[in-house]
Structures are given as C-alpha cells and as structure tokens.
Amino acid sequence: MTDVTVKSLAEEIKTSVDRLVQQFFDAGIKKSQTDTVTQQEKEKLLAHLNRQQGTVDNQLTLQRKTRSVLNIQVTGGKSKTVHIEVRKKRTYVNPSVTKPEAPLPEEENAQIPKITKNTFSQESLNKTSPQKSLKTKAIEKAKIESPKKERHSLKEKQKKEAQSEKARREAEASSLKRFAEEEVRRKVEEEAKRVAEQARKMAIENEAKWSELVADQIDSVDYHVTTSEHARAAEDENDAKVEGDRRSRHRGTKTTKQKKTNKLSESKTDREEARAVVRKSKRKPSALQQSFNKPVVALNRDVVIGETISVAELANKMAVKGSQVIKAMMKLGAMATINQVIDQETAQLVAEEMGHKVILRRENELEEALMSDRDTGVLTVHRAPVVTIMGHVDHGKTSLLDYIRSTKVATGEAGGITQHIGAYHVETENGMITFLDTPGHAAFTSMRARGAQATDIVVLVVAADDGVMPQTIEAIQHAKAAKVPVVVAVNKIDKAEADPDRVKKELIQHGIQPEEWGGDSQFIHVSAKVGTGIDDLLNAILLQAEVLELKAVKSGMANGVVIESFLDKGRGPVATVLVQEGTLNKGDIVLCGFQYGRVRAMRNELGREVISAGPSIPVEILGLSSVSSAGDAVTVVRDEKKAREVALYRQGKFREIKLARQQKSKLENMFDSLREGEISELNIVLKSDVQGSCEAIREALQKLSTDEVKIKIIGSGVGGITETDATLAAASNAIILGFNVRADAATRRLVEAENLNLRYYSVIYDLLDEVKQAMSGMLSPKYEQKIIGLAEVRDVFKSPKFGAIAGCMVVEGLIKRSSPIRVLRNNVVIYEGELESLRRFKDDVNEVRNGIECGIGVKNYDVQVNDTIEVFEIIEIKRTIS
C-alpha cells in the first residue's frame, strides 16, 4: 500500500488538517500536513482513538445521494420542473464479531493477531478480493485454535447486544417519528377537506341567494348569448371543413417518416392546448356571471378622537373618503381642508353626524394616571419660610445675604453682580429660613418672576441713597402678581447721603405702605456692610412666617420646583431643586418637565452629600436625562418607564405648540418675504453656564432687534462651547458668545481654521454692549444734505462750450467746484444738477468765498438773472442703536 500525506488523508476521512495533526500529536507522532503517513502510523493512530473511545467500532456506514428531475403537467398546458433528491444510508456489520465461535484455550490466545478497525473496514469494502478472503479464513482458524477465545467472545457478545439494543431504539424512534408525521399530515388533510366543504356550502348558499338576480340578467342577455352560440357553431363548422380539405390534400404526399418527424416535433404544450380547445368546443356555451355583495347597512364604528385630529385621520378612522368628511363639515357650517387640524368637539360632531360612536380620549391620560399613583402623606408639619431677596442691581442684595450666611458670596460674583438664582438655608436661633437670591439686572426678569412664584415672603432691598429704581418697581409687580407679602429692607443706612424717608415716600406711590404709616409692610433699616439691623430683619421674616402659618406634608413622595439647572462636564445635568412637599430621597425616580431620571446623588448648597431633603430645603440633584428648564415642577413617581413616556409626550406637545406659534398667516409671510432684502440679520450661537442665564440673555438679545437689524439666535444651550457649536456657526455665518463658559482645544482649532468670531463674557452688560456695536455696524448709513453756499445771478453770458454762464455774487458760505447745485427761481427749485465750471477773472478756481464775484457754468440749462444758485454737499451720518 502506497504512503499518503497528512493532507490527503484528512481529505479522505473528511476532517480538517489541523485536527488530524493534533490527533497524531496526541498519539505520540509529530507530523505536518506535507509529511507522509505509513500503515504502522495509521494503526497506531487508530489504536489511540480506540483507547479514547473505549470501544472498537465494528460497523461501517455508507451514504449515497441520487438526484433526478421530474416534469409535471399543470393547468394551462404548462409543465413544472420538480427536483428530486433520494438519500440512502446502509450500515455494514463485521460478521467475525457478530458471530463468535466456541471458546478456545487461553494458552493459545497470544498467537492470535490483533484485529483492528482498519482490518474490519478493509474486509467489508473488499469482500471480493481472494487475498482478503484467505486472510479472513486464516484469522478465523487462528481464533478456533486460541484457548482464550471465550473471554474475547463474551466481550464481543456484550458489545453486540448493546449495539443491537441501540439499533432497536433507533428503529423505534424512527417509527414513532414517521407515525407523528403521518398523524400531522392526516390532520392537515382533514382540515383542508373541512375548509373546502365549508367553502362549497357557502358557494351553494350564495348561488341560491342570487339565483333570481342572475336569472334576470341571463334573460336580458339571452338573445345575445344565443346569437353568439350560433355564430361560434358556424365558425367551428367552417374551420373543420377547411382543416379537412387541407389534410386530404396533403395525406397522399406525406410519408410515414415525415409523419413521425412531425409528431415528434410537435410540442407537448401544443397538444395540450389542442385538447383544451376540443374540450371547450364540446361544452355548452355559458355566460360569465360575476356579482359583488353590496352592503345594504352602514357600518357603525367606534371612533377614538384625541384632543386634536386632522380631517384625513378622522376620515381614515371612519373608513370613508376625506371628501365625505369635508361635505359633512360644510353641512355643519365649517370649512376645512383635508390636512387641516380640527379640535375634539368639531370632530365629535362630524363623527356623530355620520352615524359613528365617538370615544373621547384625553392625551394626558398617562400623565394623570402616573400622578395619581403616588404615595402622599396626610400629616402636615410647620415648615421653614422660603424668602426671596429682590431689588435693583447693586442695591446690596447679595451682600445682605452674605452677611447673614457669614460667607463671601458677593466677592465671587463676576462684575460684582448676581447672575444666577442662589438657594441657601440658614439656621437661626428662632428657626430655619431658606433664602433665594435673585439677580437685579433688567435682563433677568424671568428669573425674578420664578423666584417670586416659588417663595413665601419677598424681602425688597432698596438702597437708602439711591431710592426706588426700575428693577425695584418690577420686583414689586412680581410680588403683587404672586400675592406674596413684602418686607422692605432699606439698605446702606450707614451712608451719609442715606434718606430712608424718601424711600418710604417713593414706595407708597407703588402700593407699599409701611406699618408706621398705617400699612402692612414692615420696613427694616439695615446695613449689609456693618451688620446693622440684620437681627431685626430675621425676626421680621419669622414673624411674617408665623402669621402665614406655613405648613407642608413631610412624608410621602416629594414635589418641588427647579430653581436653576446647568450642565457639569464631570457630573452631567445638574438641577437645583427646592423641595416644597414630601421628602426627596436618593434613588427616587423624578419627572421634571421634559426630562426624567433617577436621583443618583444629592448635595446641599455647601457641596456636601445628603441622603434626603424635606420641605423648604434646596438641594442639587444628579441623574436627569438632560438639562431641565428653570421653573419646571419636579415630581417623584413610581415607574421610570411611564415617566419616560410622559416626558416624551411633553416634548412632542411642546414642539407642536412651538411650530403652531411660528406659523404665520400667508399675508404676513408675503410682506416678510418682500422685506427680506431690506432687513439685516445678526446670527448668534449662545452658550451659558446655567439655564436661567441662557434664557435671560436670549430675551435681552431678542429685545435689541429693530426694523432694520434682526437678532437671530441660531443655537443656544448650557455647557461649554463644542465643535458642534463651531460647525453650526460656520454654516450660518454666526458669532459665538460664551457666557461664563470656555471652548476646548479642538473647538479653538476649528474656530481658528474657520476664522470665526468667538467672544467670552462674564458680565451681561459687556455682552449686550458689544452686540449693540455689532448691530450698529450692520445699519445702513444715513445721508444728509448740507448747504455750503448761496450765489445770486447778476448777469448771464453765452459760452460756446457750456452754453449759459451765470455771473454771480457769493452771498453766503462758499462755492466749490464739482459740487451738486440747485437753481431756485422765486424760492422754487427748478433745476438740480452739478456745477460744471467755476471761474474767477477768466481763471479756473476750485472754490470762491463769500462776497466775491465769479462765473458759474451750468450745462444744458437756461439760467436767468435774479436766480439763486444753492450749492450743497452730501454727508454720511453713522447710525447707532440706542
């Protein structure tokens, strides 16, 4: 037997080369895929594999596949090709193992050669070989002579019994499988028969039901059918006659071989079509009768209508055309298009008018269900008052609070002014007070309004030396709108120019009456610098809180309001929340406006971690999905999944409202498009450190817009300036304004590459002033006419070059050459042009001053004596935005 390589052996036994090399290595033989394998190495490998398996296999299984193609005739004379694959599997068993002989003496057992799997395989595959037959007989003879055959036969017998048991089980399993398949096929056939029987019965019923209508239709067309039958019969007879004549002419000329060839060349499809034609001609002619069941009763549907619905969607739910819905609305006196959105009441009237049942659905059902499924306590306890400090900018609000808290907050504010809402709670001898410090700048109106809404008492700080200012009046209006009591703190009382009585008189004009003058507002004279009157102010606040009898539920799920929110680079979205009811715990699921999340961490105003927060306690929470809007209500809920759905619903609703507000009438859009070329736009990308400052700056910038220059906020947000902001600014030709934020290195490189305008600010004054300057540069210049001289015409001369030359006397100002002029006659402008020639004693001059005679040439115009020539110049005036 020739040696083979490892690779060819692997292909022969259908295994991978790497696996065969590993098996050789496990058997103690080092081989590569190009090495040859001897017969002894094969036997050694086989013995190793037998030892691993624990048994010597005495079976050989052969598999064979045969493929064939079957052509099946289908309806219409066409043939269908079906591919058939037959798989056969046969197992051969070594007879020397299955038929053990009588036991032999044990002494001769050593003389028996070892029979391997390779030997069995060779004998099974080469039964016809005479050499193999002699070898088999020799082996059997050796077995008979062996004295130890008894033990070997016993082992082989046990193996045979195990194999026969295995074969029996496999046969039983296959028979059970065939039985199950037959059962499934039988059930499928029965179901198909049942469905066919039902269809047949239904067809019989329908035929009986509509037989009368069909009979009437047949009677109406019977004449035409009969005529067509006679025509077809005559045509068939004529065709048969022609075909018979043709066959009789060619019958004698065709030979047997030609007939056979024609028959073979005729396709099977043609013969099938011919048979079909013959069968069709033998059948009686029938009229094709088809009919459809017209619904006689209108279908009443249950139509679910939300708060708003479009006409097309309403028609789709009622399964009617949109035109029918529009007709029904016109009958009710409402005009609408198919894409128009109508309200719930109108849709209900239309649907009920068309005979459908209406089910009204509130779109905020999920939100209401989520809010109702909350644990709220019933036991109320006294809570600390929430005090908002309001007043004009630089009147000492933060300094006053700074003295109360004994910290240096005011020195840390940019520009010395507050630009955020700060929330702090202070422990005093008489109780705890929560303070909200609001900005006093005019741009932070919305932030002051939020502070007034979330507060119990307003402390109005007025500087004794400055009196009532615009933001002081605005703070009074916010307090009155929120129906909150006001405690007036007259600050800077230590200054020499302080005048508290003037402050009282000015506040009386705006509805703030002091107690000593018969009103209900307490006036406390304080000095945030030296600490005068601070204790009196705290006592006044606590006294006012006792009068209000402030109570809140301490147990149960918490409710609160967002005071401020911002995006921290390391911690993510952070919201400053003032708890109003219940207890906010770490790990609670909160719904906050358009955002939701789980409270991952809570910190107080000092930056320390806390586990829970009760009523009137401000905390910073981490874990929201995004930066929330300041002023949003914070609610603790049970289900995070439902909270997410409610947040997404709110976002979609807000988007719809925003789009509806942005949509203008067609007439306004038409006028806007006509004025587009006249209006300049200043595009701005705004980034701020907190949400409240971002909103305040947006409102302040939009108020700067004029009829000629419009401020357009392309993008705004909270957090640092990113590459996305720079890309947006480059695409829209906008400037980037950063308020208390910075750009990272990658963004700065992009800004330099795109040559963008990036500016940083920490004080809102500077930001607004520079934006005003940029807007002033975009204004179109203004031109004015300035009269620089007057000349009276004393005489007129003729010139061949210029025509009429006016001899003039300069009576006012000076006359410049090449300046625009007007000719006035009886104080009426009759000509406007340019001064062509200016001479003095026949010499060309550039200008002539007052009291000097000169000659003025006016081209192509007839100047008369006593006319007045007015010389002027056009001056460009630079415009600014106030």
UniProtKB/Swiss-Prot annotation:
Cross-referenced Pfam families: EF-G_D2 (PF22042), GTP_EFTU (PF00009), IF-2 (PF11987), IF2_assoc (PF08364), IF2_N (PF04760)
Region (G4): 491-494
Residue segments, region G3: 437-440
Region annotated G5, chain positions: 527-529
Region (G2): 416-420
Main location: cytoplasm
Gene Ontology CC: cytosol
Basic and acidic residues bias: start-end ranges: 137-172, 229-246, 263-276
SUPFAM superfamilies xrefs: Initiation factor IF2/eIF5b, domain 3, P-loop containing nucleoside triphosphate hydrolases, Putative DNA-binding domain, Translation proteins
Record keyword Cell inner membrane present: no
Annotated S-S bridges: none
Region (G1) residue spans: 391-398
Transmembrane annotation, as ranges: none
Family annotation (InterPro entries): DNA-bd_dom_put_sf, EF-G-like_DII, IF2_assoc_dom_bac, IF2_II, IF2_N, P-loop_NTPase, Small_GTP-bd, T_Tr_GTP-bd_dom
Annotated keywords: Cytoplasm, GTP-binding, Initiation factor, Nucleotide-binding, Protein biosynthesis
Compositionally biased intervals (Basic residues): 247-262
Domain tr-type G: 382-551
UniProt xrefs under PROSITE patterns: G_TR_2, IF2
Region entry Disordered, spans: 95-176, 229-289
GO molecular function, one term: translation initiation factor activity
Similarity comment: Belongs to the TRAFAC class translation factor GTPase superfamily. Classic translation factor GTPase family. IF-2 subfamily.
Name under which the protein is recorded: Translation initiation factor IF-2
Protein species of origin: Hamiltonella defensa subsp. Acyrthosiphon pisum (strain 5AT)
Gene name linked to the record: infB
